[in-house]
């Protein structure tokens, strides 16, 4: 027994080394069971948790903006993404490979505050401080429409998920507007008392939901042309709104340093706030920090002024990730439509794309 133990002793530290070298050979395509042992040779190069996405590396840095980056969104097909900000440019990037910036959309005379792809990804909508909303062909990069009518900064825009291509906008002029991109002027306008910082549609696109500096979230009925109900609870300006993919719940981010989930189904109880999340912060910069849902609704993410990316578990309300790396406020975090990947846009002029388990 003693001799056996002695014999085993020095072998133990050598085993992993041998196995690693063997797998490298298999990864290169030699050996009988090459395909079984190793799917991707690249997975051996990283010394960390196993890879869970098709990104070239677990974290990719996207640099090219010349000013603060306010917004970022993945294309619905997941192969490209768009980002925009203070430099008045919209940059289009490849998600896979070297993440090259393959196109730049120009034409704004003010910062780009928010952007969204429509459901099929054929169009990109963007809102700007030059008081306009632009509609771009996401394939060619051409601007196909410019919507004018607001008298101050347009802080937010959101395209309808289904039906005719409608888009809603919210502005510092205190109005929420509804546009049909086939028409020149807004087809409906709702007058709010204070600046509107964030807007979205409900799932059926017959209501617009808005948030602003009066701390309230308002739901406007497009058929009856009036305010339907108001959701109160935030103690400071609401800077971001996002509807869950199945359309039942609304996520809001506000300067009171809370992120909330609201039940926006018809006939929901009067107290619609169902969850409160804490962990992200706003600061004196008063940037419009946005928020987003993962495609399956199991996670939420929000921008934060403490230079970290916050991702929560929706059910337990636990912070799953507080990711460092940026040198400025994180203004938006977006989830990839298919893979466990997030992208963050920051005031440090950079974007980080990384995989999360």
UniProtKB/Swiss-Prot annotation:
Presence of the UniProt keyword Nucleus in the record: yes
Major location (coarse): nucleus
Keywords: Isopeptide bond, Methylation, mRNA processing, mRNA splicing, Nucleus, Repeat, Spliceosome, Ubl conjugation, WD repeat
Chain positions found as Asymmetric dimethylarginine: 21
Alphabetized SMART domains for the sequence: WD40
WD repeats: from-to residues: 64-103, 107-146, 149-189, 191-230, 233-272, 283-322, 325-357
GO biological-process terms attached to the record: mRNA processing; RNA splicing
UniProt-annotated location(s): Nucleus
GO MF annotation: an example: RNA binding
Pfam families in the cross-refs: WD40
Cross-link (Glycyl lysine isopeptide (Lys-Gly) (interchain with G-Cter in SUMO2)): 18, 270
Highest taxon in the source lineage: Eukaryota
Gene Ontology CC, one term: catalytic step 2 spliceosome
Function: Required for pre-mRNA splicing as component of the activated spliceosome. Component of the U5 small nuclear ribonucleoprotein (snRNP) complex and the U4/U6-U5 tri-snRNP complex, building blocks of the spliceosome. As a component of the minor spliceosome, involved in the splicing of U12-type introns in pre-mRNAs.
Subunit structure: Component of the pre-catalytic and catalytic spliceosome complexes. Component of the postcatalytic spliceosome P complex. Part of the U5 snRNP complex. Interacts with PRPF8. Component of the U4/U6-U5 tri-snRNP complex composed of the U4, U6 and U5 snRNAs and at least PRPF3, PRPF4, PRPF6, PRPF8, PRPF31, SNRNP200, TXNL4A, WDR57, SNRNP40, DDX23, CD2BP2, PPIH, SNU13, EFTUD2, SART1 and USP39. Component of the minor spliceosome, which splices U12-type introns.
Protein name (Swiss-Prot/TrEMBL): U5 small nuclear ribonucleoprotein 40 kDa protein
Protein's gene: SNRNP40
């Amino acid at each position: 027994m003693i001799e056996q133990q002695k014999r085993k002793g020095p072998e133990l530290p050598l085993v992993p080394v041998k196995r690693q070298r063997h797998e490298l050979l298999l990864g290169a395509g030699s050996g009988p069971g090459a395909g079984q042992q190793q799917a991707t040779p690249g997975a051996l190069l990283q010394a960390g948790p196993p890879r869970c996405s098709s990104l070239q590396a677990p974290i990719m840095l996207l640099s090219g903006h010349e000013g603060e980056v306010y917004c970022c969104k993945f294309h619905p097909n997941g192969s490209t993404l768009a980002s925009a900000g203070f430099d008045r440019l919209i940059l289009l990037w490849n998600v896979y490979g070297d993440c090259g910036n393959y196109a730049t959309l120009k034409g704004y005379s003010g910062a780009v505050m928010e952007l969204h792809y429509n459901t099929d990804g054929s169009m990109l909508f963007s809102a700007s401080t030059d008081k306009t909303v632009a509609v771009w062909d996401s394939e060619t990069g051409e601007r196909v429409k410019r919507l004018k009518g607001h008298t101050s900064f347009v802080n937010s825009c959101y395209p309808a998920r289904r039906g005719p291509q409608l888009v809603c906008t919210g502005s510092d002029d205190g109005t929420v507007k509804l546009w049909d991109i086939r028409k020149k002027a807004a087809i409906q306008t709702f007058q709010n008392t204070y600046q509107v910082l964030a807007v979205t549609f409900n799932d059926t696109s017959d209501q617009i939901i808005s948030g602003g500096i009066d701390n309230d979230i308002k739901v406007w009925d497009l058929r009856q042309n009036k305010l339907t109900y108001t959701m109160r609870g935030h103690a400071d300006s609401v800077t971001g709104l996002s509807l869950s993919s199945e359309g039942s719940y609304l996520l809001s981010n506000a300067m009171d340093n809370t992120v909330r989930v609201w039940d926006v189904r018809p006939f929901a109880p009067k107290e619609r706030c169902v969850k409160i999340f804490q962990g992200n912060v706003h600061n004196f910069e008063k940037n419009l920090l946005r928020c987003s849902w993962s495609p399956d609704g199991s996670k939420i993410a929000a921008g934060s002024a403490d230079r970290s990316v916050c991702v929560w578990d929706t059910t337990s309300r636990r912070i799953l990730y507080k990711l460092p790396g940026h040198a400025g406020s994180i203004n938006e975090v977006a989830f990839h439509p298919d893979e466990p990947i997030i992208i963050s846009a920051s005031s440090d002029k950079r974007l980080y794309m990384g995989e999360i388990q």
